């Protein structure tokens, strides 16, 4: 099962936490749709800010949004202008009071979503897929990863028939629950069609009582 299941969901409750931290009874569907709208809006609004994860917490009529990004300065803006504008936009979108926390990702080369997104953008820029994948793997291993696996699927280099190419370095123990494995799936929209990019990064083992995080510094607005 470890080879098939999403590694992030497989480890929730063991070494990972939920990205949506709230409970609802009859309003569950409304809150879930609101979460999806918030995530989609932030993804579109901060497309160039290297945003990896958006965590949402709820309390009464208040929504706390934590944005994990490798470029906190771009999200915050000069004197906090950008994050304040974003907060007002989310207030209008949800009709609730929104509080935004900016969490800096200290090592973006160890974040699967940012690595996969980087590979996807290079594929869109017509860079050879092998070069993009191997470059990302080398940077991740230099940053301290214990192992990394990347996979690209689709009409590679414009070939008539789609295929899957994958490369790995180090070890990626998918069956080990205490293994801190970050996983991401991204898309590259090329002139030949859509390419799927999957990334697995093994960052070491974690005790179940200690939830590992790639984010060290946190600021709020």
From Swiss-Prot:
<keyword id="KW-0699">rRNA-binding</keyword>
<dbReference type="GO" id="GO:0006412">
    <property type="term" value="P:translation"/>
</dbReference>
<keyword id="KW-0694">RNA-binding</keyword>
<dbReference type="InterPro" id="IPR001351">
    <property type="entry name" value="Ribosomal_uS3_C"/>
</dbReference>
<protein>
    <recommendedName>
        <fullName>Small ribosomal subunit protein uS3</fullName>
    </recommendedName>
</protein>
<dbReference type="GO" id="GO:0003729">
    <property type="term" value="F:mRNA binding"/>
</dbReference>
<dbReference type="InterPro" id="IPR005704">
    <property type="entry name" value="Ribosomal_uS3_bac-typ"/>
</dbReference>
<dbReference type="GO" id="GO:0022627">
    <property type="term" value="C:cytosolic small ribosomal subunit"/>
</dbReference>
<dbReference type="GO" id="GO:0003735">
    <property type="term" value="F:structural constituent of ribosome"/>
</dbReference>
<dbReference type="InterPro" id="IPR015946">
    <property type="entry name" value="KH_dom-like_a/b"/>
</dbReference>
<dbReference type="InterPro" id="IPR004087">
    <property type="entry name" value="KH_dom"/>
</dbReference>
<feature type="domain" description="KH type-2">
    <location>
        <begin position="38"/>
        <end position="106"/>
    </location>
</feature>
<dbReference type="InterPro" id="IPR004044">
    <property type="entry name" value="KH_dom_type_2"/>
</dbReference>
<dbReference type="Pfam" id="PF07650">
    <property type="entry name" value="KH_2"/>
</dbReference>
<comment type="similarity">
    <text>Belongs to the universal ribosomal protein uS3 family.</text>
</comment>
<comment type="function">
    <text>Binds the lower part of the 30S subunit head. Binds mRNA in the 70S ribosome, positioning it for translation.</text>
</comment>
<comment type="subunit">
    <text>Part of the 30S ribosomal subunit. Forms a tight complex with proteins S10 and S14.</text>
</comment>
<keyword id="KW-0689">Ribosomal protein</keyword>
<dbReference type="Pfam" id="PF00189">
    <property type="entry name" value="Ribosomal_S3_C"/>
</dbReference>
<dbReference type="InterPro" id="IPR018280">
    <property type="entry name" value="Ribosomal_uS3_CS"/>
</dbReference>
<keyword id="KW-0687">Ribonucleoprotein</keyword>
<dbReference type="InterPro" id="IPR009019">
    <property type="entry name" value="KH_sf_prok-type"/>
</dbReference>
<dbReference type="InterPro" id="IPR036419">
    <property type="entry name" value="Ribosomal_S3_C_sf"/>
</dbReference>
<dbReference type="GO" id="GO:0019843">
    <property type="term" value="F:rRNA binding"/>
</dbReference>
């Amino acid at each position: 099962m470890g080879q098939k299941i999403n590694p992030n969901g497989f480890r929730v409750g063991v070494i990972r936490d939920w990205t949506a931290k709230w409970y609802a009874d009859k309003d569950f569907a409304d809150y879930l749709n609101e979460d999806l709208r918030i995530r989609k809006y932030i993804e579109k609004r901060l497309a160039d800010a290297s945003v990896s994860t958006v965590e949402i917490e709820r309390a009464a009529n208040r929504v706390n949004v934590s944005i994990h990004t490798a470029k906190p300065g771009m999200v915050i803006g000069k004197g906090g202008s950008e994050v304040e504008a974003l907060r007002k936009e989310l207030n209008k979108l949800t009709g609730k009071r929104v509080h935004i926390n900016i969490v800096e990702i200290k090592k973006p080369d160890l974040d699967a979503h940012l690595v996969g997104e980087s590979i996807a953008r290079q594929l869109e820029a017509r860079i050879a897929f092998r070069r993009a994948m191997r470059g990302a793997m080398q940077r991740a291993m230099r940053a301290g990863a214990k192992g990394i696996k990347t996979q690209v699927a689709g009409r590679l280099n414009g070939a008539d028939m789609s295929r899957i190419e994958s490369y790995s370095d180090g070890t990626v123990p998918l069956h080990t629950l205490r293994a801190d494995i970050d996983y991401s799936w991204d898309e590259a929209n090329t002139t030949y069609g859509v390419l799927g990019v999957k990334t697995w990064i093994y960052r070491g083992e974690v005790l179940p009582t200690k939830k590992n995080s790639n984010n060290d510094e946190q600021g709020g607005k």
